[in-house]
Amino acid sequence: MSEAVDVLVVGSGPAGSSVARRIREIAPELSVLIVEAGPDLTPDAPGENVRNLPAAERLPLQIRVSGPQPVGFQPFGSRPLHARPGTVLFREDDGSGDGQEGMPGGAFSANVGGMGAHWTCAVPRPSGSELSDVLGREEWDAAFAVAESYLKATTAAFPETPASVAVLAALRGVYEERLAGARPAGPMPLACEPTAQGPRWTGADTVLAGSPVPVPIRSGTVVVAIRAEGGMATGVETVDAVTGAREEIPARAVVVAGDAIRSPQLLWASGIRPPALGCYLNDQPQVTVGARVDVPRVNAAIDAEADLRETLTGVCWVPFADGAHPFHGQVMQLDASPIRFHVDDKRDERPMVGLGWFLVKDVRREDRVRFDDARPDAHGLPGIVIEYGLTDRDRENVARAKREVAALAAALGEQTREPQLLPAGSSLHYQGSVRMGSVDDGESVCDGSGRVWGTENVFVAGNGVIPTATACNPTLTAVALAVRTGEAVAAQLAGGERRGR
């Protein structure tokens, strides 16, 4: 048995790291341990975003997580699906169906830093109906302010260029009247520190660097059960990912901060099963198209060794707005986009951009992840079965989004292909499976602090806590909620508070 800790955090991604940091800021006397199932890819800076590394160093690390990648160009979304570098599909795709049933694009990252070691770093604030009324507006604003400071959110990640000026002018021409009174189109808020060499992208290392007391991370350690008696967690049981050795770690509180699939999996395996566990699984349907922008390319020569996502060209967005724009739009020159587009062979000096439109989805209880105890995984955790699909209204919104991006591509210059709806799960933005609520009525898994209903000291953090239909990237929201969870845990343990069930 390991030495006891005050708080054990399961998962080292942006949410788990933010919980740990907030606890240390408020109650530095509390001991906090982060446990991560995957390996440490960047030992010199655990949890660093691998986009900060040269391409030659980055690829072996990504392959270490996801395995060998397909040879040759694979346009993203082509079936059968292959996991993008640094991720692993929840299930192998057989290429059947239209890609919208069962979330075939769903994937996860098992490494120190979680998905935060590979992400594109978009951190816009949600607005309107995207925000849950479980929290008041002042509570949201306070949490967002802390989250933005942790992630180093900025709209000045890239210097202005002729290409970015042309894109932004076109966006404002198309959307200025439509978004009157709402947030305008503009530079995308990104999690990074601008430098003369380009942005330094935020990872878990960035978040934890601000902790007043170092937070240890134990990698290669799979948590297979939370030990609890009468709603009170006493610690966790772990399995060494390499040797299979089992160990128990006593803890006064446990925070489950995995993704929206594996967090409910662990709760289920631990016998912690609120009625809504795994239900209301919510992805963001994603429509993409490519366009050539009518502006001369200034810097045509690009170092072949450079990551094309990291050259200074800019990322713009068209915000979600209730009643006016039911989508979250991203316009990213291909060097900044995580999606690979097919580009024809003809020579064209115009910059190529990718348009990615994220849609709000009908949130339904029947969209869910359920667990099969009879078919456990390699570590003994229950098998995962995803039940998920689009409604008629979702498909109508997809058709509308396709028309919108096609028209915008024409306004920018030239559309290069037909708009495409990516397979469900491709956004990697799935939410809702451990959703928060105001009351324990069977429709949510936790309260507004992340404490799981029916428990004294088990908390959840991450995208899965978000209960609403959202279009914008969820990381900032997840970190904001994680900040509140850290505050609640610190207050409960440091203050000796025992909350009633």
Curated annotation (Swiss-Prot):
State how activity varies with temperature: Optimum temperature is 30-40 degrees Celsius with carminic acid as substrate.
Cofactors that this protein relies on:
FAD
> Pfam families per the record?
GMC_oxred_C (PF05199), GMC_oxred_N (PF00732), Lycopene_cycl (PF05834)
Q: What class of enzyme is it?
A: oxidoreductase
On cofactor binding, the record's note says: Binds 1 FAD per subunit.
User: What catalytic reaction does the record list?
Assistant: carminate + O2 = 3'-dehydrocarminate + H2O2; isovitexin + O2 = 3''-dehydroisovitexin + H2O2; isoorientin + O2 = 3''-dehydroisoorientin + H2O2; mangiferin + O2 = 3'-dehydromangiferin + H2O2
Record keyword Membrane present: no
Region annotation (Disordered) maps to: 74-106
**GO MF annotations in UniProt:** flavin adenine dinucleotide binding; oxidoreductase activity, acting on CH-OH group of donors
**Amino-acid positions noted as binding FAD in the UniProt annotation, renumbered to this chain:** E36, S109, N111, M115, T120, A122, V223, N463, T475
**Activity: how regulated:** Activity is inhibited by Ca(2+), Zn(2+), Co(2+), Al(2+), Pb(2+), Hg(2+), Cu(2+), Fe(2+), Fe(3+), Sr(2+) and by the thiol reagent p-chloromercuribenzoate (PCMB). On the other hand, Li(+), Na(+), Mg(2+), Ba(2+), Mn(2+), Cd(2+), Ni(2+), Rb(2+), Cs(2+), chelating reagents and the thiol reagents 5,5'-dithio-bis-2-nitrobenzoate, N-ethylmaleimide and iodoacetate have no significant effect on the activity.
Which UniProt keywords are present, listed alphabetically? Answer: FAD, Flavoprotein, Oxidoreductase
Q: How does activity depend on pH?
A: Optimum pH is 7.6 to 8.4 with carminic acid as substrate.
What EC number(s) has UniProt assigned to this enzyme?
1.1.3.50
Task: Report the superkingdom from the record.
Answer: Bacteria
Subunit: Monomer.
Biological role: FAD-dependent C-glycoside-metabolizing enzyme that participates in the degradation of certain C-glycosides by catalyzing the oxidation of the hydroxyl group at the C3 position of the sugar moiety. Shows oxidase activity toward various C-glycosides such as carminic acid, isovitexin, isoorientin and mangiferin but cannot use puerarin, orientin or aloesin. Shows weak activity (100 to 1000-fold lower) with O-glycosides. Probably plays a crucial role in the metabolism of C-glycosides in nature.
Family designation: Belongs to the GMC oxidoreductase family.
Q: What is this protein called?
A: C-glycoside 3-oxidase
